[in-house]
Amino acid sequence: MDRPQDPFNSRGIAVPPAVKMRNMAGNNSPWIDPLPPPMNARNGLANASLFSTSLPVLPHEKINFLDSARGTPLMDDASAKLKELDDDPEGKDYKFDFDLRQIDDLLPNEDDLFAGITNEIEPAGQTNSMEELEEFDVFGSGGGMELDTDPVESITAGLGNTSIADGLRGNGVNHFGPSNSASTVAGEHPYGEHPSRTLFVRNINSNVDDTELRSLFEQYGDIRTLYTATKHRGFVMISYFDIRAARGAMRGLQNKPLRRRKLDIHFSIPKENPSDKDLNQGTLVIFNLDPSVSNEEVRQIFGTYGEVKEIRETPNKKHHKFIEFYDVRAAEAALRSLNKSEIAGKRIKLEPSRPGGTRRNLMQQLGHDIDQDEPRSYRIPHVGSPIASSPPGAWAQYSSPTDNNLLQAFNASPTGNGMSPIGMPPSLISNAVKIAPIGKDSNWSKYDKVFSNNNQPHGAAFQHSHSYQDHKSEHMSSSPGTLTGPEFLWGSPKPYSEHAQSPIWRPPAIGHAIPSNTRSQGQGLLYGGRQASLFGSQDQLHHHHVGSAPSGAPFESHFGFLPESPETSYMNQVRFGNIGNIGSGRNGTGLMLNMAARASVNPVSALSGNMSDNNSSSFRPILSPRLGQSFYGNPTYQGPGSFGLDNSIERGRNRRVDSSVFQADSKKQYQLDLEKIRKGDDTRTTLMIKNIPNKYTSKMLLAAIDEFHKGTYDFFYLPIDFKNKCNVGYAFINMISPVHIVSFYQAFNGKKWEKFNSEKVASLAYARIQGRTALISHFQNSSLMNEDKRCRPILFHSNGPDAGNQEPFPINGICIHMPLEDGAIATGDPFGNEEDNNQNERTAGEEL
């Protein structure tokens, strides 16, 4: 079929509309420039020889520099095909080859046309993805060349748009630009795979025994739950108490063969609507906290219950803080002991933080951060802080668990600038073990010195997220004018410092060491307890847990205090420290914890200060077992090249051993010693009865006790699981006199229960809160007293004609009689925590 002749096509070829437009416009078109315009940094370089004196011209796979016929830059393959279109002598009909022949022929598309009309100066076309940015980056893979940019404004697009180059050091530059996603990384979850305490282990051989699985994973830490019901389907779920144990198991067992199958391990993200049992993910929310209380003071208070991972603040709510523990058991202990206690004159409230808060708030936090007006270096989140089932705080994600993508280009610029591409001091960048891909070899030894010997022209930036890092590397960067380690986190001088004259205490650098010669910026200490100079300081060794608060010795006073006897120090008002005391932050008066009877016993109270501060002759100083030979700043030298992943794991195992010993010692103080009781050396009276069958009611249990011990006790409490409407497996009883404990112990301890054919064996231990008065004080202000009367604690007359009979329980001066009835069912929380209602069986001393 013949087509009409196109007046603008002399050869009878079907010309695309865009070409017709150009022909109709002729040379007078305002959109056609007879001379090729120079190209800016976004669209390429018109004159590559501009950089010929400093860098060889690097060919780009999509740049053909000039078309000899037109003298016009050809930027991609589409333009090359259009060149063939104009020079084709055969006069083919391109109508049926339309998708192979691009039609814009160097004319801008519609967006470019409109952009050219409204703005004749700025180049048209805005890149909107990392892939397009890479096309225009001539130096992105050649020599690590970085253009001069402002270190603060270089993160205008937000940390979510940061790309860290993969490969060797110096082999990439960061790209910034609008991104169509918020920091998405490779992984099976929307925001990547977040470290959590629960591991989803796939590719499991169904013949593997549960004990074999437990022994394999238990070497990395105590296992909270082991779910193997789906083992026949090829996967199991393993949950740890400590998130560090989960991360260690992930790294140590990923792709390891088990019964000829390689394990495929992933982190399991907590449910959006968790059960009460899953609610505790190691993070507590502190409400009604006085804004004058610093993070260091909070760390000191809560650090007595376990190692603090980090403390986060909410920008708009200064009286709220989030405190995250490594171990969920520490969070439970702190929740039970400190909830509704008074700190700095205010009664605080503690609640467990619900999982999923980070995912829900990540986009909102990132957007909120970007919109702020203050310099962006003041909002840089801590790189090493993983997103781990905890609320507000936005973290950038820099690597995928499945990609070998270390932070290799962070400080690898050949220009010698110690600042990272996102304007972040290296001293605040986490170590290799926390940022290395999960399940891969870290290969960090090649890059470790990048963070150890760097010039740092900028001081440390303030962070809303105060993370206490793991001790994974023996050395971190430090230079005059940069607050690092304890200086930045605790506001104290370096407890363990070294001088340049003693290089033996650090492994030799690979190649030639780069001395630190940066001038001091003159920052002061943040609420330091003692003045210290920042001038001339060199690299330091951190012998506390870098990433957790220093255990037992956070400041200059490296002593803990251990009560020699369990006396009434349970209710002492404890003043924290003298030299590095808690109160030295703002007014130097010392922070008083007015917890009265709610204060808890701590086997090694991490309270820095003098023994006289506690006014107790039974306190004696002990050395922290974690400090070892490094107690006075002299670490154990491990030889050249001894840093890296292997030694970090070994140190982690050593810490776990220390922690196990510490926990064993902690449990000993709750064990009953009948000999001491007979001699009168141990005067405690409150006992915890463990391993009670869940179907037992208060009436049943009291009937068993009253058979031989009626009138020997004055307090009884059987906690109830309100969800399942049964007891939680333990109870508390206060004996009138310690002498009654011996017979009670002989009657119950190690004996099986008569009812329900239970296999459980009763066990006795001391409770944490001791004495009738302390128990009443603990419960009378609890929200439990507002719930069902049948689940409340019970008081008994201890003398007189009514001895052994119930007496009213005082609640805020009002006596309420509590009749004892069978089938105790309640809907409240026995310890005043409205959220955590599902109480599990716990070890001795953890509940009261």
Swiss-Prot record:
RNA-binding as UniProt keyword: yes
Region of interest (Disordered), ranges: 370-400, 455-523, 826-848
PROSITE patterns according to UniProt: RRM (PS50102)
Keywords annotated in UniProt: Repeat, RNA-binding
GO MF annotation: an example: RNA binding
One BP term from GO: positive regulation of meiotic nuclear division
Domain of life: Eukaryota
RRM domain mapped to chain residues: 197-270, 282-355
Transmembrane segments: none
Cross-referenced InterPro entries: MEI2-like_RRM1, MEI2-like_RRM3, Mei2-like_Rrm_C, Nucleotide-bd_a/b_plait_sf, RBD_domain_sf, RRM_dom
Chain's role: Probable RNA-binding protein that may play a role in growth regulation.
Name listed for the protein in its UniProt record: Protein MEI2-like 2
Gene: ML2
